[in-house]
Design a protein with these regions (language model features):
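N-terminal membrane topogenesis motif
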Residues: 1-27, 77-84, 210-226, 473-484
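Interhelical loop/hinge segments that connect adjacent transmembrane helices in multipass membrane
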Residues: 1-7, 175-182, 194-234, 282, ...
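Signature of the first transmembrane helix
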Residues: 3-65, 94-102, 127, 158-162, ...
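Helix-terminus/linker motif at the lipid-water interface of multi-pass membrane proteins
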Residues: 24-42, 109-111, 172, 231-271, ...
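Interfacial segments at transmembrane-helix termini and the short loops linking adjacent helices
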Residues: 40, 105-124, 256, 318-349, ...
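Specific pore-lining/lateral-gate transmembrane helices of multi-pass inner-membrane transport
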Residues: 73-88, 261-374
């Protein structure tokens, strides 16, 4: 069985643990945006708070997932000891930061413009602490090739999360608690992770190695900075809307209203992000495990080529079927932002390619380049949002995201060629992307009033595109899958 086939199989299983749970979580948008639950300005507060959470989570992990993969796969390494070292570092950082947030929750709440709601900060601090404590155990499941266990843990958690959201917001809803239910549901659902990894966590003992621990921190902190910059790129546009959107830009509506619309439509673009995440979970340990193979450059190039094809299918399928996907957003007032979804889908496609290209600085121990490239992305994000938001509102934020991720991808590719020669099929990849965009533009320019006819036509377009790609790629794909 070929290595790519193995990777594809693991990606499917990680999809069960990432795409399905996050897609189910995505369906919660329908509940949260219902007119009887949260108005756009309330949903905007949720969007803002989880944006801060994503940034802090990256700091808590401190790049230890990737550091664990790197040090545990070195020749002669003791995987169990490396695991304990990584877990010790993460827990030490997480307890310190989460404890500080809890101790000063009221002050933090005032700082982020939710004065009087310090309990939200406390909820989020505990949620982030539990996420961090189980992050390395989940990474270990990936390294030990246990994607089924990974999937079970994620699926049960999301099942609890959905059930609790439905119970709190439909059965036992109290308007005085409001958005607090969302954080409370996350907190209770996360407690399952502690039970799921109870044996691993109870067996863990803090350990420090005066040689390996500093080396892991030195390797991991550029990864953390890269991740922090990456999260900033992803989340900054949402926070920037709150700060830089001119008053009354959307007539009669607040910045929180615009942020709510933008955040809800962003969720549709997360369909691409889910596929990227599932692939990354399988691919990252795969790249490290196959780094010593002489044929690895050609292997990595083929993997990226097929990855781009799959992403193009997602881009096409979602972009020309927004008349169906819009119903996931609940109240019709959220639909006004649907036109930004294709822009964000394309942005996430570039982000996925960037993750593939970034293998060169991880395998050559030049992780500082990841920091340099992503900090450049942050600067691009800040400037683009500053220029575009006052002129185009949340559409400007969408274009800023695309400009950032595409620029990072280009920089990573150009610099990486100097250190690790990987024969990526850049021309073929770009051709597929351009063809997809042309089809999206053409199809969306055609107005079909009958919804059933429109949906059928769109499905035929997607199926036809997939068949054409299959006939173009069938020979090389069969050869690839047949290789040992």
């Amino acid at each position: 069985m070929s290595k790519i086939r193995n990777l594809a199989g693991e990606t499917v299983l990680y999809g069960l643990g990432t795409i399905i749970p996050r897609f189910i979580n995505f369906l919660l948008v329908r509940l949260h945006t219902d007119e009887s639950v949260f108005a756009p300005d309330e949903y905007g507060v949720i969007t803002k708070l989880f944006a801060y959470t994503a940034v802090i989570n990256t700091i808590l992990l401190f790049g230890m997932e990737t550091a664990y993969f790197r040090f545990a796969t070195k020749a002669g390494a003791d995987e169990k000891r490396v695991f304990r070292l990584a877990q010790t570092i993460v827990i030490a950082i997480s307890v310190a930061i989460s404890g500080g947030l809890i101790a000063f929750s009221d002050g933090v709440a005032s700082l982020i413009n939710i004065a009087g709601n310090g309990q939200y900060v406390t909820y989020l601090a505990i949620i982030m602490l539990t996420d961090a404590v189980v992050a390395i155990p989940f990474a270990r499941l990936r390294l030990l090739k246990k994607p089924l266990m990974f999937a079970i843990g994620k699926l049960v958690n999301i099942g609890l999360l959905v059930g609790l959201n439905v119970y709190f917001l439909v059965v036992a809803y109290n308007p005085e608690i409001g958005i607090g239910y969302v954080f409370l549901a996350n907190l209770i659902a996360n407690s399952f992770y502690l039970l799921f990894f109870a044996r691993t966590l109870l067996q863990w003992r803090p350990v420090f190695d005066r040689i390996v621990s500093p080396a892991m921190v030195q390797y991991g902190y550029p990864i953390m900075l890269t991740g922090l910059a990456g999260i900033t790129n992803e989340m900054f546009s949402r926070l920037a809307l709150d700060a830089w959107l001119p008053e009354n830009f959307y007539e009669g509506q607040s910045a929180d209203y615009a942020l709510g619309i933008f955040g809800a439509c962003y969720k549709l673009a997360m369909l691409m992000s889910l596929a990227v995440t599932a692939f990354r979970y399988a691919a990252e340990p795969f790249f490290f495990s196959n780094a010593a193979d002489k044929q690895s450059p050609e292997l990595f190039a083929r993997i990226n080529h097929y990855f781009v094809i799959v992403c193009c299918l997602i881009l096409l399928g979602v972009s020309i079927n927004l008349d169906i996907f819009k119903y996931f957003l609940g109240d019709a007032q959220y639909w006004e932002g649907l036109y930004i979804v294709p822009i964000l889908l394309l942005a996430y496609l570039f982000l996925g390619v960037y993750y593939n290209f970034s293998v060169w600085f991880k395998l050559t121990d030049r992780t500082y380049w990841g920091t340099i490239i992503t900090v450049a992305g942050v600067l691009i994000t800040v400037v683009a949002n500053y220029v575009l938001i006052p002129r185009y509102g949340y559409e400007g934020s969408s274009w800023a995201t695309l400009i950032c991720y595409s620029s990072m991808t280009v920089i990573c590719y150009l610099v990486g060629r100097r250190y690790l020669a990987i024969p990526y099929n850049i021309g073929g990849n770009l051709l597929y992307v351009m063809a997809t965009l042309l089809i999206v533009y053409t199809v969306n320019s055609v107005t079909i009033t009958n919804s059933w006819v429109a949906s059928t036509f769109h499905m035929v377009v997607v199926a036809s595109f997939a068949l054409i790609v299959f006939f173009i790629e069938r020979k090389s794909f069969r050869q690839t899958m047949a290789n040992k």
